[in-house]
UniProtKB/Swiss-Prot annotation:
EC category name: transferase
Cited InterPro entries: Dual_SerThr-Tyr_Kinase, Kinase-like_dom_sf, Prot_kinase_dom, Protein_kinase_ATP_BS, Ser/Thr_kinase_AS
Cellular component terms per the entry's GO annotation: anchoring junction; apical plasma membrane; basolateral plasma membrane; cytoplasm
Name under which the protein is recorded: Dual serine/threonine and tyrosine protein kinase
Cell compartment(s), UniProt: Cytoplasm; Cell membrane; Apical cell membrane; Basolateral cell membrane
Active site (record annotation): D770 (proton acceptor)
Gene behind the chain: dstyk
Record has Transcription as a keyword: no
Source organism (scientific name): Takifugu rubripes (Japanese pufferfish)
Residue ranges that the Swiss-Prot or TrEMBL entry lists as coiled coil: none
Length: 921
C-alpha cells in the first residue's frame, strides 16, 4: 500500500473522528483554564510571601496573615487527577477473543481491509497440531506516508527488513504480524509493529491491538494506556460465549484501567450471509446473560432494531459497559459510548476545577467580609474601650470624693453596732504565745504590750471586714457594668493583633492594671500585703494606752483595753485615709491604662492599613480574576453535559445583552437565554462575579432560576466571545403587566413577592441594587420573581460604584457609600407604580430632561407625587421607604407584614375602599 493522500473513511470512522475532534477542542480550553489557575495560585503565593518578607511584622503576625491564603492552592490528590486527565490523549484499545476477532474489528474501525482475515490470516490463535499464535502488538499512528516498522515500546526503532517494505501491499503481510519460532533475538520478540497511516481518525487518536496472550500478558500489553491516556476499550466477540480465561483477563483489564468496555458481537466470517441475523437473535441473549452474570455488564437493557441502546445515559452519569449486538449498525452504539467516555473525563476535570474555583472564591468573599468588619469594628472597639474606661474612672473618683463623709458615718455606725460584740469578744479572747494564769496574775510589761496589740488586732480585723464589705457593695454595680465589658472588648482587640512576646507582656500588664485598679475589693478580702499596709495606718491612729504598773490579765482588763481602743479610733481620719488611697490607686491605674491603650492603638493602626490594602486587592483583583476562571470552568462543564443552546427569537434587549427564546436546554423547558458580549476585562470580571453570586444562591421561588452558562467562542463569526446565560423563562415583565392591566390584589401580591425576594437576597448577604419594573418578571398566575442580578453584590465586595436605574436610585448611591437600604428605596418607587397601576412616570421625574438633572433633583429631595387614588397607609409606606435618611427607612421585615395587612384590608375587608385604586389601573 502506497500513497500520500488521506485514506477514505467509513461513516463509523468519520463519526469517531468528529467525537475525538470535539474532545480535543474542549481539551484546549481545559488546559488553558488549568494553566491560568496554576499561574493565579503561584502569583498569590509569591505576592503574600513577598508582602510578609518586606513587612515590619513579626514572624508570628506574618504567618497569621499568610495563613489566610494558604488554602488558595490545589489539594495534592486533585492536582494529580487533573495532571493525568487534562490533555490526556484518547487511545482506542482493541481487545478480543482471538486475533481474528481483533483484526476484524480493527478493519471495521478504519473502514478498510488492512489486516488479514480468514485464510489470509493463517492458523487460528488456538490452532491444531499444538500450534500457538504469536502475533505482535500493533500500534496505529498518523503520518503523511504509509509505513511499517518494528520498535521497542518507548525506546527505539529496530533495523529489520519487513515483508511489507519489499513491495506493494493492500493488507499487512501475515509474516510481519507474527513472531517466528526461530527468532531468538529478545528485542525482536518484544518489539511492536508500528503502522503509520494517513487516516483522519488517527490524527485524533492512536489505536492499539493487543498481542496474543502467549506473546505478552494482557496486564503488560495495556500498560501504555495507564499513563496520560483515555482508553476507549473495545472487546471483539466472535464466539457464542467467553471462556473462563477470557473472563479473568477482562477483570484484570477493568481493575487496571477502571474504564467501561464496549463489547462488540462480530459475525462469523464462515457463516452463510443469509443466516447471521437469525443466529445473532439466538446467541445474543446467551452472551448478554453471561456478561451480566459475571458483572461485566450492569444494565440488562439491550439494543433496539436500529442498533442503538434502548436506554440513553443520563447527562453526567458515569459511563457503563455496553454490548453492541448488531455489527452492521455498530456506529449507533460505539460512537455514543466513545463520546460518553471522553465527556465523562472532561466533565470530572471541569467539575473538579470549578469546585476548587468556587471554594477559593467563597474564601475570598468571606475574608472580604471579615476584613471589612475588622476595618469597621476595631476603631469602634478602641474608642469604646477609651470611653468606658473614662466613665468608670470618673464614676469611681466621684465615689471616692463623695463617700468620705458617708464612710465616716458608716464607720461610726459600724463601731456603734459592733461595740458590745467587740467588747465581749475581747473579754473572751485567748491570747497566743502568752501564758496567763487562771487568776489573772500580773505578767511582764512585754507580755502586757503583746496582749494589748492582740486586742487591737481583733478590733482592726473586725472593723476591716465590716467597712470593706460596705465599700464593696457601693462600687459593685460599677464592676458589673464596666469592667466585664472592658475586659471582653480588650480581649478581642488583643486577639485581633497577635504580635511578639513584648506585646503579649504589655497586654497582660494592661489586664493586671485593670484588675489592680478596679477589683479593689479583692485586696480587702485577701490577707495580702496591700491589706496589711492599708490597715497598718489604722493601727497607728489608735492612741497608745499608758500604764505604770503591769495590771492583772482579767476579762475586765481585756474589756477595758478594748473600750479604750475603740474610743481612741477617729472615724474621720479612717475615712480620709481610705478615700485618699482609693484616689491614688485610681489615678495611677488610669494613667497606665491610657498609655497601654495608646500603644495598642498604634499597633492596630499599622495592621488596619495593611488589612485595607489587602481588602482592596481582594475586591478589585483577586476575586474578579478567580471568578472569571470559575465562569469558564463551569461553562465548559455545562456545554459538555448539555451542549450549546439553540437561540430562538429575540425577546428583548437591555444595556448589557440580548435575551432570546431557548426552547430546551439541560432538561429545562422553556428557557430564556441572555447573550452578553463583555467589551473588556472589567465587564468580564463583573459578569463572572454576578454569575458566581447567582449560581451559588439556593433556589428560591421569588428569584428567577439560572440553569447554566455557555461561553460561545464562535459568536459573530468568531470575532468576539459571548457568554450565554440560560435561565428560567417567565410569561412577561412587570412593566408589560402593568400596561396590560392588573387587579389591586394582584399588584399587592406582586409587592409582597418582591419584598420576599429582596429579603432573601439580603439574608444571603447580597444587595440587588437595580430593583425596577423590567427586573420583576411575572408567571402566568402573575406571581413575581426578581431577575437580572447584574448589579448584585455582597456588601463587603462593593467598591462604591454608581450603578442602577436613575429613577429607582437612592440618593446615597451617588456618594458611593451605601448599604442594603438602597433596595428598600428602590422598592418604594416600585410600590408607587404598583399602587398607581400604570407605567406613567411621576411628574417630578417626567420634567427632567437628562439623567444629571434627575440625579440632582433626587439628591435635593424630589420624589413621586401622591395620586388621588392612593390609600393613606400605602402612601405612608412609600414615603417611609424612600426616606432620604437611610437609617429611617423601614426594615423589610416590617414592610412585609404591613403589606399583608393592607392586602387583607383593601382586598378582603372592604370592596368600597379599594374601588378607587382599582379604577387607576
Amino acid at each position: 500500500m502506497e500513497g500520500h493522500g488521506p485514506q477514505k473513511s467509513s461513516p463509523l470512522a468519520r463519526d469517531l473522528t468528529r467525537a475525538f475532534n470535539g474532545y480535543h477542542k474542549q481539551t484546549v480550553l481545559l488546559k488553558k483554564n488549568l494553566k491560568e489557575t496554576h499561574a493565579f495560585f503561584r502569583e498569590m503565593r509569591q505576592n503574600y510571601s513577598n508582602t510578609c518578607a518586606s513587612s515590619t511584622l513579626s514572624s508570628d503576625s506574618a504567618s497569621l496573615e499568610t495563613s489566610q491564603f494558604s488554602c488558595i492552592s490545589f489539594p495534592s490528590h486533585e492536582e494529580e487527577f487533573l495532571r493525568n486527565t487534562v490533555g490526556a490523549a484518547p487511545y482506542i484499545l482493541v481487545l478480543g477473543q482471538d486475533c481474528a476477532a481483533r483484526y476484524q474489528l480493527l478493519n471495521c474501525l478504519l473502514g478498510e481491509r488492512l489486516l488479514p482475515l480468514g485464510p489470509q490470516a493463517g492458523h487460528a490463535c488456538h490452532g491444531g497440531q499444538g500450534s500457538t499464535c504469536k502475533r505482535r502488538k500493533l500500534c496505529f499512528t498518523h503520518g503523511k506516508q504509509t509505513r511499517l516498522s518494528l520498535a521497542l515500546p518507548g525506546q527505539y526503532e529496530l533495523v529489520h527488513q519487513l515483508v511489507a517494505n519489499c513491495g506493494r501491499w493492500d493488507t499487512v503481510p501475515r509474516e510481519d504480524l507474527e513472531i517466528l519460532d526461530e527468532c531468538e533475538d529478545p528485542a525482536h520478540r518484544q518489539a511492536e509493529l508500528e503502522i503509520t497511516l494517513h487516516h483522519p481518525m488517527l490524527q485524533e487518536a492512536k489505536v492499539m491491538v493487543v498481542p496474543c496472550p502467549s506473546v505478552q500478558p494482557i496486564e503488560e500489553a495495556i500498560e501504555d494506556c495507564t499513563r496520560s491516556a483515555i482508553p476507549i476499550v473495545l472487546y471483539a466477540v466472535n464466539q457464542d460465549s467467553l471462556s473462563s480465561e477470557q473472563v479473568a483477563d477482562l477483570w484484570k483489564v477493568k481493575e487496571i484501567l477502571s474504564f467501561p468496555i464496549c463489547f462488540v458481537r462480530l459475525p462469523n466470517l464462515s457463516e452463510d450471509s443469509s443466516e447471521p441475523g437469525q443466529r445473532f437473535e439466538k446467541d445474543k441473549s446467551k452472551l448478554q446473560k453471561q456478561l451480566l452474570s459475571h458483572g461485566l455488564l450492569t444494565c440488562p437493557m439491550g439494543n433496539c432494531s436500529c442498533g442503538a441502546p434502548t436506554q440513553m445515559p443520563t447527562p453526567g452519569a458515569k459511563p457503563q459497559s455496553v454490548l453492541g449486538e448488531n455489527f452492521e449498525r455498530l456506529h449507533r452504539i460505539l460512537v455514543p459510548f466513545t463520546r460518553q467516555v471522553l465527556q465523562n473525563q472532561q466533565v470530572e476535570a471541569a467539575s473538579l476545577l470549578n469546585g476548587l474555583h468556587c471554594r477559593c472564591l467563597d474564601l475570598f468573599i468571606n475574608q472580604a467580609f471579615d476584613m471589612q468588619r475588622d476595618l469597621q469594628i476595631t476603631p469602634r472597639r478602641l474608642e469604646y474601650t477609651r470611653e468606658k474606661e473614662g466613665e468608670l474612672f470618673t464614676s469611681l473618683m466621684a465615689i471616692a470624693n463623695r463617700k468620705q463623709e458617708e464612710m465616716k458615718d458608716m464607720i461610726v455606725e459600724t463601731l456603734g453596732s459592733m461595740k458590745e460584740q467587740l467588747l465581749e469578744d475581747a473579754a473572751n479572747l485567748e491570747f497566743t504565745d502568752i501564758i496567763v494564769t487562771t487568776n489573772g496574775d500580773p505578767v511582764t510589761s512585754k507580755e502586757i504590750k503583746s496582749c494589748i496589740h492582740q486586742i487591737q488586732d481583733l478590733i482592726v480585723v473586725r472593723l476591716n471586714q465590716a467597712v470593706a464589705n460596705k465599700l464593696i457593695s457601693s462600687v459593685d454595680y460599677l464592676r458589673e457594668s464596666f469592667v466585664g465589658t472592658l475586659e471582653r472588648c480588650l480581649d478581642s482587640l488583643e486577639k485581633s493583633h497577635i504580635e511578639s512576646s513584648v506585646h503579649n507582656i504589655t497586654s497582660n500588664h494592661l489586664k493586671q492594671l485593670l484588675n489592680a485598679a478596679y477589683h479593689v475589693e479583692v485586696t480587702f478580702h485577701s490577707g495580702s500585703s496591700v491589706t496589711r499596709l492599708f490597715w497598718e495606718q489604722i493601727k497607728q491612729i489608735i492612741h497608745r494606752i499608758t500604764f505604770v504598773n503591769p495590771p492583772a490579765i482579767t476579762p475586765e482588763w481585756k474589756r477595758k483595753v478594748a473600750q479604750d481602743a475603740i474610743e481612741s479610733l477617729s472615724a474621720a481620719k479612717l475615712a480620709r485615709s481610705i478615700c485618699s488611697q482609693f484616689r491614688t490607686r485610681l489615678n495611677s491605674s488610669h494613667e497606665a491604662f491610657a498609655a497601654s491603650l495608646r500603644q495598642l492603638e498604634e499597633r492596630h493602626t499599622g495592621r488596619l492599613e495593611r488589612t485595607e490594602d489587602l481588602w482592596l486587592r481582594v475586591r478589585k483583583d483577586h476575586a474578579p480574576r478567580l471568578a472569571r476562571l470559575s465562569l469558564e470552568s463551569r461553562s465548559l462543564r455545562d456545554v459538555l453535559l448539555h451542549g450549546k443552546p439553540k437561540l430562538g427569537r429575540e425577546l428583548g434587549r437591555g444595556q448589557y445583552g440580548v435575551v432570546y427564546l431557548c426552547d430546551n436546554w439541560g432538561g429545562h423547558y422553556p428557557c430564556a437565554l441572555k447573550s452578553v458580549v463583555p467589551p473588556d476585562d472589567k465587564h468580564w470580571n463583573d459578569l463572572a462575579l454576578e454569575f458566581h453570586y447567582t449560581r451559588t444562591l439556593p433556589k428560591h421561588e421569588r428569584l428567577v432560576d439560572l440553569h447554566g452558562s455557555v461561553i460561545d467562542h464562535t459568536y459573530a463569526g468568531g470575532s468576539s466571545i459571548a457568554v450565554l446565560l440560560i435561565m428560567e423563562r417567565l410569561h412577561r415583565d412587570l412593566y408589560t403587566g402593568l400596561k396590560a392591566g392588573l387587579s389591586l390584589q394582584e399588584r399587592l401580591q406582586i409587592a409582597l413577592d418582591v419584598v420576599e425576594g429582596i429579603r432573601f437576597l439580603h439574608n444571603q448577604g447580597l444587595l440587588h441594587r437595580d430593583i425596577k419594573l423590567k427586573n420583576v418578571l411575572l408567571d402566568k398566575q402573575n406571581r413575581a420573581k426578581i431577575t437580572d442580578l447584574g448589579f448584585c453584590k455582597p456588601e463587603a465586595m462593593m467598591s462604591g460604584s454608581i450603578v442602577g436605574t436613575p429613577i429607582h436610585m437612592a440618593p446615597e448611591l451617588f456618594t458611593g457609600k451605601y448599604d442594603n437600604s438602597v433596595d428598600v428605596y428602590a422598592f418604594g418607587i416600585l410600590f408607587w407604580y404598583l399602587c398607581a397601576g400604570s407605567v406613567k412616570l411621576p411628574e417630578a421625574f417626567e420634567k427632567c430632561s437628562s439623567k444629571d438633572q434627575l440625579w440632582n433633583n433626587v439628591k435635593k429631595g424630589a420624589r413621586p407625587e401622591r395620586l388621588p387614588c392612593f390609600d393613606e397607609e400605602c402612601w405612608q409606606l412609600m414615603e417611609a421607604c424612600w426616606n432620604g435618611d437611610p437609617s429611617q427607612r423601614p426594615l423589610l421585615g416590617i414592610v412585609e407584614p404591613s403589606l399583608q395587612s393592607m392586602m387583607v384590608r383593601l382586598c378582603c375587608g372592604s370592596e368600597q375602599k379599594s374601588s378607587s385604586l382599582e379604577d387607576s389601573s
